[in-house]
Structure formats: C-alpha cells, structure tokens
UniProtKB/Swiss-Prot annotation:
Pathway per the UniProt entry: Amino-acid biosynthesis; L-tryptophan biosynthesis; L-tryptophan from chorismate: step 3/5
GO biological process: L-tryptophan biosynthetic process
Keyword Isomerase: yes
Chain's gene name: trpF
Name of protein: N-(5'-phosphoribosyl)anthranilate isomerase
Domain of life: Bacteria
InterPro entries, per the entry: Aldolase_TIM, PRAI_dom, RibuloseP-bd_barrel, TrpF_fam
TM ranges: none
Length: 222
C-alpha cells in the first residue's frame, strides 16, 4: 500500500497542481513568518481551492496565538492543523476543541530521548510527524533538509499513525520507506531548487521514486 504523501510549503499554483496530479494525499501551507515557505492565509486559501475533496489541506503553525489560528482557520478552512511548536498535550486538546479539527503533532528527533514525549500525546494527537531536529542556530523548526536515524522509530507499532519527514528526497525515500514502513511521508526541501522554491520536475522525481520503491512492497504484500 502506497504511503500517504504530503508536499509541504507550497506557494504556487503550478506546484499545487503537480502535487495533486501526482496523487498527493496532503498539501501543506506554512504560516511561520521566519520560514522561506511562509504564505499569507488569504493566498493559501486561493491555492488550496483545487485540492478540496482531492487532498487534505494542512495548516502548519508554530506556537500560534488564538488570533493567528482564528484567521488561518477562517480563511483557509483546513482539514488538519500541524503543530510544529512546543504545544503541550493540554494545549493540543484545547486547540482541537476550539476548532473541531484533527491535529498532527510534530516531534523533532535527533536521539531516542527525543521520542520519550510521544507517549503523552497518544490518544490526543490524531497523527504524529517525526522530523529531524534543527541544527544549532537555525531559526526554522523544520524544512532544513537534514535527516535523522530512522531506526529510532523501530519501537512504533501499527497503532501509531505518523508521517516521516526530515531531508527526504528522491535519492533516499526508498531506503526511508524500507527502514520505517512509514504510513506517511512529508517532503518540502527535497522538491525544491532553493529554499521555498518548489520544482515541478523535482515533485515528479519524488513521486517516481516513491512509486518505484512501493512496487516491490505491493508485490510482497507489505
């Protein structure tokens, strides 16, 4: 079974169109002003229109205020909120209650210790996303184009729904899927020519690589 595929940090209609044509299950818009992938909520709403009913629209936020979330949810009408900050389990529950939307909680990973917090969110977050921990000095919590040791996720069983992120690209996504059997994958910098500049050709190459990697898994029934 092919994993869910999320193309994140979209900013142009061409990139959205190609992601949808290639079968992206999720498209992500980033509302963190320090990111080169930042987009205004009203523009994101226009770009998201062709995706409605075809792919889940994900709003990516980092420790947002209620006012910021109000504006994003009102304009974009996302299918899911991706929380990429330091939101506590209690705060996640509050956000879910306020907006009636499922939440994907992000964990930044470098060592096994970074995963100890996950258990507190099981049954609270609807899905997890595991990304590489940002290098020292980086202002960006994600989208840094670096990977982590995927074997750290070996303790996860089928009851934990998650997406794998962090430096995925056409050259390493097959190995990532082989090691983790991740039910979902998330790519941003791996389909760019420069930070925030999505490449239609690179989106194609990424999907081609996933489909090639998935073929033997389908044949073996994995």
């Amino acid at each position: 079974m092919r994993p869910d595929i999320k193309i994140c940090g979209l900013k142009t209609p061409e990139a959205v169109d190609r992601a949808l044509k290639r079968g992206a299950t999720h498209i992500g818009f980033i509302f963190f002003e320090k990111s080169p992938r930042y987009i205004e909520p009203d523009l994101a709403a226009k770009l998201a229109e062709p995706a409605r009913g075809k792919a889940k629209i994900v709003a990516v936020v980092v420790d947002p205020t209620n006012d910021e979330l109000d504006e994003i949810v009102s304009l974009l009408k996302p299918d899911m909120l991706q929380l990429h900050g330091n939101e506590s389990p209690e705060h996640v529950l509050t956000i879910k209650a306020l907006y009636g939307l499922p939440v994907m909680k992000v964990f930044s990973v470098r060592t096994a210790d970074d995963l100890k917090r996950v258990e507190a969110y099981i049954g609270i977050a609807d899905r997890f996303l595991f990304d590489a921990k940002a290098p020292k000095g980086s202002e960006l919590p994600g989208g840094n184009g670096i990977s982590f040791d995927w074997s750290l996720l070996s303790w996860l069983d089928g009851s934990v729904d998650y997406m794998l992120s962090g430096g995925l690209n056409k050259d390493n996504v097959a190995e990532a899927l082989f090691v983790t059997k991740a039910p979902g994958i998330d790519v941003s910098s791996g389909v760019e020519t420069a930070p925030g500049v999505k490449s239609v050709a690179k989106i194609d190459e990424f999907f081609d690589a996933v489909e090639k990697a998935n073929a033997p898994m389908m044949a073996s029934g994995s």
